[in-house]
């Protein structure tokens, strides 16, 4: 095992000199004793003359020139497998939840090749989430990628937690949650929420918070992904949650600047598309198992043409747009049914009935949007009988798109509901065809299946 010494420290960038015949490879992990703690460095560049440029995975405070550095001769390796479930780990796979060692059987390197073309699976199978608006309007593909776009406080995290809960309980699947550049408080809240919902033993949590150095935040998504790949290769269907993919890009920008690369558009790193591609190409399904990923996407200054969200868009199969306007009506989940899209919403994939129902719901809601201006100026009485019917049905649909969540029971006071896709299609189709025109619209608010709405109407 070769040993070198530190020759230069500039913030998170550390240059290390090795003997000419024992220079570490790019992405190898190096270890240095910094006081009582050991710090891991990752090689980014070979500068020649036996010197390598590295990025620190932790604080570089206290490092000085001349300190001995050990080459571990392999990339950063993290624990994988069932031992990671229910635990909180950092970028190096070390536990940070005070519950002792992880006791893993296996460790995998975080830098891995994406599955080869032959291994990829081309199944068009849908992943039922039990959330009506998502299953109907923007269905998820098993092994697909979903972007959750939304501002602060419209429910990105609650939606994520409900998805983890539904898949853990209804599909007995495992999930991996990677908090990339997260607020520490959010990570803490998330942990307690998972504990209260009794699904912690089905989730591995990997955190690299906002206060960590950029190298740490850039690699933490790969750590989470590696754990998910292990579950996939065991033949499981896994969910990978990344919150927030924008901060992964931002960490890459910081590292790129520290390494002295020329910035490109808007100051982003010149390798933005490649870095995003390296991550996204590994999040895929093979013939053994699938990884379905849900990624929260922060949109800087609400500009979807910003290079970061624009690069992310290219990789997504479905986009779930959370709307503040819908949240203000008290309709949760606040998914915008006219703005959210999915590649799976195709009659060849979901079937003609599902497709027609979803498009019918969209056209009714679109017509209602157009009629709103007329209603605001002239009132309901000026509408034709046909338009009055459109408004009545659209308002029922709008309310029926709401749903009580299991993870939000403490706020809503009503028990959570899981609605099968069959019941979802039946309900919306019935409303559009006028089967429930005689029921009051309040009966459709915060219920699960259409049968519950009928029951609720009897009590009103």
UniProtKB/Swiss-Prot annotation:
Give an example GO cellular component term for this record: proton-transporting ATP synthase complex
Which UniProt key words apply to this protein? ATP synthesis, ATP-binding, Cell inner membrane, Cell membrane, CF(1), Hydrogen ion transport, Ion transport, Membrane, Nucleotide-binding, Translocase, Transport
Instruction: Name the catalysed reactions.
Output: ATP + H2O + 4 H(+)(in) = ADP + phosphate + 5 H(+)(out)
State where the protein is found. Cell inner membrane
What are the binding positions for ATP in this chain? Answer: 150-157
Q: Which Pfam families match?
A: ATP-synt_ab, ATP-synt_ab_N, ATP-synt_VA_C
The Enzyme Commission number assigned here is 7.1.2.2
- Which InterPro entries does the record associate with it? AAA+_ATPase, ATP-synt_VA_C, ATP_synth_F1_bsu, ATPase_a/bsu_AS, ATPase_alpha/beta_chains, ATPase_F1/V1/A1_a/bsu_N, ATPase_F1/V1/A1_a/bsu_N_sf, ATPase_F1/V1/A1_a/bsu_nucl-bd
Q: What is its main location?
A: membrane
- Which GO MF term does the entry hold, naming one? ATP hydrolysis activity
> What is the recorded membrane topology of this protein?
Peripheral membrane protein
The record's subunit annotation is: F-type ATPases have 2 components, CF(1) - the catalytic core - and CF(0) - the membrane proton channel. CF(1) has five subunits: alpha(3), beta(3), gamma(1), delta(1), epsilon(1). CF(0) has three main subunits: a(1), b(2) and c(9-12). The alpha and beta chains form an alternating ring which encloses part of the gamma chain. CF(1) is attached to CF(0) by a central stalk formed by the gamma and epsilon chains, while a peripheral stalk is formed by the delta and b chains.
Described by its record, this protein's role is as follows: Produces ATP from ADP in the presence of a proton gradient across the membrane. The catalytic sites are hosted primarily by the beta subunits.
**HAMAP family in the record:** ATP_synth_beta_bact (MF_01347)
Q: Which family does it belong to?
A: Belongs to the ATPase alpha/beta chains family.
Q: Name the chain's protein.
A: ATP synthase subunit beta
Whichever gene encodes this chain, its name is atpD
């Amino acid at each position: 095992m070769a040993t070198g010494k530190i020759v230069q420290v500039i913030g998170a960038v550390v240059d290390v000199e090795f003997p000419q015949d024992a220079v570490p490879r790019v992405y190898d992990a190096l270890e240095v004793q910094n006081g009582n703690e050991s710090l891991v460095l990752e090689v980014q560049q070979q500068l020649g003359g036996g010197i390598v440029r590295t990025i620190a995975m932790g604080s570089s405070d206290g490092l000085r020139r001349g300190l001995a550095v050990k080459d571990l001769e392999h990339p950063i390796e993290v624990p994988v497998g069932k031992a990671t479930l229910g635990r909180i780990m950092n970028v190096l796979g070390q536990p940070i939840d005070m519950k002792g060692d992880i006791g893993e059987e296996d460790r995998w390197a975080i830098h891995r090749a994406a599955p080869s073309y032959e291994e990829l699976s081309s199944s068009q199978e849908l992943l039922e989430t039990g959330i009506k608006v998502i299953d109907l309007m923007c269905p998820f593909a098993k092994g697909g990628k979903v972007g959750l776009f939304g501002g602060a406080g419209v429910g990105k995290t609650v939606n994520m937690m409900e998805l983890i809960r539904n898949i853990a309980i209804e599909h007995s699947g495992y999930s991996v949650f990677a908090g990339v550049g997260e607020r520490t408080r959010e990570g803490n809240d998330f942990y307690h929420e998972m504990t209260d919902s009794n699904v912690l033993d089905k989730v591995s949590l990997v955190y690299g918070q906002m206060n960590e150095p950029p190298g740490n935040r850039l690699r933490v998504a790969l750590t989470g992904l590696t754990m998910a790949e292990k579950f996939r290769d065991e033949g499981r269907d896994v969910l990978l949650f990344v919150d927030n993919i924008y901060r992964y890009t931002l960490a890459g920008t910081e590292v790129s600047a520290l390494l002295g690369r020329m910035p490109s558009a808007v100051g982003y790193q010149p390798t933005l598309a490649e870095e995003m591609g390296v991550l996204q190409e590994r999040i895929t399904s093979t013939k053994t198992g699938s990884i379905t990923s849900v990624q929260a996407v922060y949109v800087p200054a609400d500009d979807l043409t910003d290079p970061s969200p624009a690069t992310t868009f290219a990789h997504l199969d479905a986009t779930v747009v959370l709307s503040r306007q819908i949240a203000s009506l008290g309709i949760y989940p606040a998914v915008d049914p006219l703005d959210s899209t999915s590649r799976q919403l195709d009659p060849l994939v979901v079937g003609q009935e599902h497709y027609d129902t979803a498009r019918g719901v969209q056209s009714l809601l679109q017509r209602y949007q157009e009629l709103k201006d007329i209603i605001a100026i002239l009132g309901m009485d000026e509408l034709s009988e046909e338009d009055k019917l459109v408004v009545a049905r659209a308002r029922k649909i709008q309310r029926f798109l709401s749903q009580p969540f299991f993870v939000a029971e403490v706020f809503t006071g009503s028990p959570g509901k899981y609605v099968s896709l069959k019941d979802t299609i039946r309900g919306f189709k019935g409303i559009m065809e006028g089967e429930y025109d005689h029921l009051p619209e309040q009966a459709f608010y915060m219920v699960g299946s259409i049968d519950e709405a009928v029951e609720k109407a009897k009590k009103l």
